[in-house]
Amino acid sequence: MQNSTILQQKIQQKLGLKLNRNQFREIERLAFEISKRDNISYDKVLEPLEKKAGFIKFSSKLKFFFLKNTLIKYRFPQTSQNQKIDQKNIFLSKVKQPLNDNWQVKPPFKPLKIFVETEVIKSQLLTNFQEKFPNIEVEEIDYYSRYVKTNKFTISELKKPLVFIVKERGDFIKRCPCTKKHLTCGYWIFNLGFGCPFDCSYCYLQQYSNFPGLILPANTEDFFTSFDKFSKNLKKPIRIGTGEFCDSLALDHITEYSKTLVPYFINKKVLFELKTKSDNIANLLTLKSSPNIIVSWSLNPASTARKEEQATASLDQRLEAAAKVQNAGFGVGFHFDPIIHLDNWQKLYGEVIDKLYSKLKKPFAWISLGTLRSNRQLKTATELRFPESNIFYGELFLGEDKKLRYPDFIKEEIYQEITNKIKQYDQKTPIYLCMEDKQTWNKIKGLVPSNNIENSLI
């Protein structure tokens, strides 16, 4: 990471400009992101400004505005050419040093310690862990929430493999939260724990930096009781899944959740989804299958998976697992989310789609598309924990919901290109967008209708 003092000196020496604290924060942020994205020094970032005729004669105020506006054009070249940039929508936070003591995730998963609530001390889930890891330390606690409040954790401990086996007391079932003014697909979430043994640079769970490890409920039978009551009021089938705050299958060889979930949902008028980045399907292949049980995989180019999705299965491993599950009689689905606007994104995502349709039989239950998006806290956490990652140095701006998103012209190009590529192979699989507004949805040809999303996916 280049030194702030050095940049300040270079600006003063080369450009004859002394910045106040707030001005320097903005300039440093822009210069830092350009240097990271393009892998160049601060000298190279400032070089074009030194050559600007008459710059040295500008007043200090004009120099600052010219410097900032020029760096904005370098930082957001495509958007600068397509539209006027509202500077209020540029997130210019203070540049921070990355963590030196960040916990590194290394497969295979091995828990560091298990905390178990008293009410579930005799649970099968704890027995499963102890059988797999006979020397693991186990500590009995009353409530995990109370433990976390009295034992403070830092972001550097975020991915420590601490396991909390708990009795879930909240709502097992809830609607998938959808951003205001964005279209919902009618999805329901089955709350099957919190946290993930994988470590993706873009994962929004990083915002919950005060809680390390994984929370796993031991009382899944209470969910079945709850869902039996809930389902009596359903007027039509729903889609429900477990992959919102955890990976559905990453630890299935230990938790064995699938062994009870799949038989339970086979007889229900729902589409039940298990969402994963793993190839942990051994338990599934021993179970009776049904098309209403959908196993879905998140897909990104192989190079992106290697760089940004630590400890996950490779792209090839995911597709091989999907083919086995499909051949066993389960439904399969795929999520291109987040799609990252890389330099050669058309080629990279096109290759993923080519490989997908060469290995599996169409049609699929569904395919969703969603471009990279995050709140400001997530970008900061990613910079601290993944200093080698450049994904947030693409052309991302704060939207109405205060999330960082690509501008409409980039999103629309991505969605249309990928939809067209899928349609070359497959006219039947329903394609939908995740967390997008109606205006964007209606501009893309080939998606399920924006006014009938839920019914189109059931």
Model-derived regions: residue spans:
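Flexible, acidic/Gly-rich N-terminal and inter-domain linker regions that tether
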Residues: 1-185
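Structural preference for beta-strand elements that scaffold enzyme active sites
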Residues: 113, 237-241, 271-273, 292-296, ...
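Conserved Radical SAM active-site core
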Residues: 164-182, 201-296, 324
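Conserved radical SAM core fold
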Residues: 247-249, 279-282, 293-312, 338-342, ...
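Short, electropositive alpha-helical surface patch
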Residues: 255, 297, 345-361, 388-393, ...
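Flexible glycine/acidic-rich beta-alpha junction loops that bind and position SAM and/or redox cofactors
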Residues: 308-309, 340-345, 365-402, 438-446
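Conserved C-terminal portion of the radical SAM core fold
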Residues: 318-378, 421-433
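C-terminal accessory regions of radical SAM enzymes
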Residues: 390-458
